Amino acid sequence: MSASREKNKRKEQAAVPETANEAKKGMSKGLKTTLIAVCTVLVVCIVVFFYMLTSGFFASHTTAATVSGHNLSPAMVNYFYKNAYSTMQEQYGDFMSYILDTNSPLDEQTYDADTGETWADFFTQQGLTTAAEVYAIADEAKANGYTLSEKEQAAIESQLTSLDLYAAYSNMNRNSYIAAVYGTGCSEKSFREYLEVTTLASSYAQSINSGFTYTDAEIAAEYEANPNSYDAVTYRQFLVSDSLFQTSTDSSDESTADSSDESTADSSDTTEELSEEELTALKEEMASTMAADTAHDEQAFINAAYENAQDSAKESYADESYTLKEDQLYSSLSSDVADWLFDASRTEGDTTYIANDSGVYYVLYYISRSTNDYLLPNVRHILISVSDTSDETAMEEARAKADEILAEFNAGDKTAESFGELAKENTGDSNGDKGGLYENIMPGQMVTEFNDWCFDESRQPGDTGIVETSYGVHVMYFDGFGNSYRDTLVENALRTADYNAWHDGVVGDNAYTTVPFGMKFTTK
């Protein structure tokens, strides 16, 4: 190889790394720019996503469910969910803790072992079913030009304003407090929407219900067609159950009972085991014998109930009214018992026994049947509220206030109108704007003490009195008599049937659908 060719080859080899380095340097610069741009976008996206996630954006801007043609955000679902929970809590009170663990997450507690459904699932279903009903009725209201009254709008504003007190106590503003109570993404805006739609639906439904009216002829025709639905019976009842025959025996030995050893001194109770067939035979024998021996002899029935009762219950049965069931409606009884008691051929003193599906025997003594054709009382009252009626100091203050109000009434013209004015000024009840008036009070509608005063047979218009209940102290005024109890029962039944027909036509099957992505942002 010549010297010149060798020289050229070395030049070519030397040039290769330079070209490669130049190419490498060129790719690195472009790639870096691209990577930086991509990373920047990703970082921004991540920051924005987490901001949207933590700020509640998704909870207020995505769709979690669709009801009656309305898309509900996760925040709106939260309101109905919380309402479903609160409704059950109000229904069961302190017993709620026996149904579920109120201190543990609901989505970790099984409601239905067969389906795996959790309590969170249950309340979600209840809430969305209610939401479907609410929006359907609200749409119907709007379609018919129905709007909230000024009073209802003011009530919504008052409810929102009241949140400020709780928010301030927790060092929060209104929005943050609503979010803390109902879940991330919940705000005054969405909560106001929830209050407006639920108030509108409730108000419109009430207006529809109260709008149904019936003539005397229609009421009379309904009663004649279905008297059992509106009459009431009075009877006596004694229950014969397994417990009457399952006695306990002391299995400890007398010699060991005197022992100083605690492990042997304690006696243990064992229950005499009877077969199901033996128990059934014993129960039927007692029930049939009691029914046969006490027919047309009410005192004999009372005595037999006392004799057959367990020793632990004899004190209760010593009260002759313990077995007495007065003015019972057909709808309040089991079908077998009701059918016998309401049989048109029934006469005073008739007896029978009926076994239910649980093996309990009802021994029955028929006394009378009422057509409930008597007038219902109209009563005004002024409530002096006492939060804790066991607080004697507070009760004494309430009694003094009640005496003062009654004295002021007696010093005036003693009219219903003047009592009503005093009620508006002094009552702690919600009906103050009506002058404390309750019309057509149904038997058992009020607490016992209040009810007994209203239905006292000696009661006359203008009567006054003071009654103490679990709510505090009531200044009472008997305003007179209203409608027939029977007619009221009939009218209520007709109204319920008509309202249910209207409701079903508007609401349908309460259908709803959920959106899995949106439901992820609900708070449970």
PLM ranges: what are they?
Residues 81-84, 88, 131, 135, ...:
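Sec/Tat-exported extracytoplasmic proteins
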Residues 56-189:
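N-terminal targeting/tethering segments
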Residues 2-5:
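Membrane-embedded alpha-helical bundles of multi-pass transporters/translocases
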Residues 8, 12-60, 177-280, 328-400, ...:
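PPIase-associated folding chaperone regions across multiple families
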Residues 284-336, 404-448, 479-480:
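Peptidyl-prolyl cis-trans isomerase
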Residues 102-113, 314-322, 326-335, 339-344, ...:
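Surface-exposed intrinsically disordered loops and tails
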